[in-house]
Amino acid sequence: MFRLPALPRIPTAPFCPSEVRGCVAIPPDLPLWKKLLRFAGPGLLVSVGYMDPGNWATDIEAGSRYGYSLLFVVLLSSLAAMVLQCLSARLGIVTGKDLARLSRERYRPGAVRVQWLLAELSIVACDLAEVLGCALAFHLLLGVPILGGVALTALDTLIVLGLKGKNFRQLEAIVLGLILTIGLCYFVELALIRPHWPSVAGALVPSWQALSAREPLYLAIGILGATVMPHNLYLHSSIVQTRVVSETEPARREAVGLSRLDTIVSLSLALLVNGAILVLAAAAFHANGHQDVADIQDAHRLLEPIVGTAVAGVLFGIALLAAGQSSTFTGTIAGQILMEGFLELRIPCWQRRLATRALALIPAFVGVAMLGDHAIGRLLVISQVVLGFQLPFAMFPLIRMTGDRALMGTFANGRLTSAVAWCLFAVISVANLWLVWQVLAG
């Protein structure tokens, strides 16, 4: 059987799964609230993937075209993501292995290689969205040409190198700071634009009438596809193992509960950010007659004159930059997890980062060079289509494994959880395949 050669093990950042496993101690005699604080963190790293520029594009278009009416789709998509991420975390805590490694152990080599390639493709697609978002942020904030901004994003490998010697908790703190930056920017934006909050609250109630036409249904599926990230399912099952958990059933049950709370709180932050983007677009654009804003550049261009202050545009750019940079770390971690889990292969983290970014830079450069600055919107759509296509291949083994009593024991999915999970699999798979077909059909 062909095996990839092992490469030198030279860690340069706290990203290699086997090196950070069990690095955060949680003494059993700690008070519950201190245990919760020690356990908080993995959910934050996962939540970053739910705030990438692909989400921005779909939320902005939904808000500008249909006002607040699709806000409930953001809510339901986030709830679906919470269910799947809780399953992923439980798998990692109970088995002590991540989804990629378990897939390697339980499936045939050919199927494992296909899974690995598809998962790597999803990371590159996500990184493409980050490249475009950061390049656009450099353009909006500093006036750098889009192509120049794309080139600047290659320097984020230096950020990974700069984390040499940092521990995993410091990495989580950095990501938390970036998430808070995004949240603060949108808090100020909403304070400036002053949306109609009763209408916002009413839009949280599901309204199937809002999806009766083809166009809002298309956008709703786009929101769903942009919200649930496939590589996050691999990521979460691994990084929860940074917490030291006793192998006794009560200790694992407590860890599962703490992880569930961490996941819900962290993804609620992502929900607030995505909801704020849609609400801002609805209040600033839809309410003022600009119902054709379909990309991030147009949103930034119109925001300042509508709000009446240059601060609005600056905050928008800062939040976009923070969203792109925060995913630098999680993309690198997820890549290491895939290589170590599927292939038993470890390489220096900066090399891993450089390889992923190089693959993402190629379509970004070609697209912008050939189609101009407005290619960003099209490329973001393509990145979300790729992510949507890969998602079922990550969901299926996750749901199947967490429902396997031989593997999970008493922690296996109950009937209700299994029913909800398989329904989500069916709905998300059909929705994403329909979205892929619509995009390919033009």
Curated annotation (Swiss-Prot):
Name the record gives this protein: Divalent metal cation transporter MntH
Membrane topology, as annotated: Multi-pass membrane protein
Gene label: mntH
Pfam families: Nramp
GO cellular component: plasma membrane
Keyword Membrane in record: yes
Cystine bridges: none
Organism of origin: Ralstonia nicotianae (strain ATCC BAA-1114 / GMI1000)
Record's function text: H(+)-stimulated, divalent metal cation uptake system.
GO biological process terms held by the UniProt record: iron ion transmembrane transport
Subcellular location: Cell inner membrane
GO terms for MF: cadmium ion transmembrane transporter activity; manganese ion transmembrane transporter activity; metal ion binding; symporter activity
Similarity section: Belongs to the NRAMP family.
PANTHER family reported for this sequence: NATURAL RESISTANCE-ASSOCIATED MACROPHAGE PROTEIN 2 (PTHR11706:SF33), SOLUTE CARRIER PROTEIN FAMILY 11 MEMBER (PTHR11706)
Spans through the membrane: 67-87, 141-163, 173-193, 216-236, 264-284, 302-322, 357-377, 379-399, 420-440
UniProt keyword NADP, yes or no: no
Predominant cellular place of this UniProt entry's protein: membrane
Keywords on record: Cell inner membrane, Cell membrane, Ion transport, Membrane, Plasmid, Symport, Transmembrane, Transmembrane helix, Transport
